[in-house]
Amino acid sequence: MVPRVWSLMRFLIKGSVAGGAIYLVYDQDPLGPSDKSQAALQKAEEVVPPAVYQFSQYVCEQTGLKIPQLPAPPKFNFHIRDYWNSGVIKVMSALSVAPSKAREYSKEGWEYLKERTK
C-alpha cells in the first residue's frame, strides 16, 4: 500500500512541477521576442532570490537545520538575450534535423551490420 501511495505522490509532484513550468512558459513567453525574454529574465532575477531566502528560512524554522547563506548571484556583463536566442535557434534546428539524422544513422548501422554478417 505504501509503495503505491509513494508512487502516486511522486507522480503528482512531478506533474505539478511540469504543469507549473508549462504555465510559466506560456504566461511569461520567454521563447518569444527578445524584449519579452529580457523582461522575464529581469523579473526572475528580482523575484527568485527573495523567494529562495524565504523558503530556506521556513525550512530552518520547521526542521531546526541551519542553512548557510548563499552567495550573491553573479552579474552578467553581456546581453544574455543574444545568447539565449542563439541557443534556442540552435536547439530548434537540431530538433528539426533529428529525424533525418536518425534515419541516416540507422541506415548506416544497418549497412554496417549487413557487411559484418556476410
UniProtKB/Swiss-Prot annotation:
Compartment list: Mitochondrion inner membrane
Cellular component aspect of the GO annotation: MICOS complex; mitochondrial crista junction; mitochondrial inner membrane
Membrane topology: Single-pass membrane protein
Record-linked Pfam families: QIL1 (PF15884)
All ranges on the Mitochondrial intermembrane side of the membrane: 27-118
UniProt record, GO biological process: cristae formation
Keyword Zinc on entry: no
Keyword Transmembrane helix: yes
Transmembrane parts of this sequence: 8-26
Domain of life: Eukaryota
Keywords of the record: Membrane, Mitochondrion, Mitochondrion inner membrane, Transmembrane, Transmembrane helix
Major localisation: mitochondrion
Topological domain ranges for the Mitochondrial matrix compartment: 1-7
Subunit structure: Component of the mitochondrial contact site and cristae organizing system (MICOS) complex, composed of at least MICOS10/MIC10, CHCHD3/MIC19, CHCHD6/MIC25, APOO/MIC26, MICOS13/MIC13, APOOL/MIC27 and IMMT/MIC60. The MICOS complex associates with mitochondrial outer membrane proteins SAMM50, MTX1 and MTX2 (together described as components of the mitochondrial outer membrane sorting assembly machinery (SAM) complex) and DNAJC11, mitochondrial inner membrane protein TMEM11 and with HSPA9.
Family according to the record: Belongs to the MICOS complex subunit Mic13 family.
Function: Component of the MICOS complex, a large protein complex of the mitochondrial inner membrane that plays crucial roles in the maintenance of crista junctions, inner membrane architecture, and formation of contact sites to the outer membrane. Constituent of mature MICOS complex, it is required for the formation of cristae junction (CJ) and maintenance of cristae morphology. Required for the incorporation of MICOS10/MIC10 into the MICOS complex.
PANTHER family from the UniProt entry: MICOS COMPLEX SUBUNIT MIC13
The name this protein goes by in its record: MICOS complex subunit MIC13
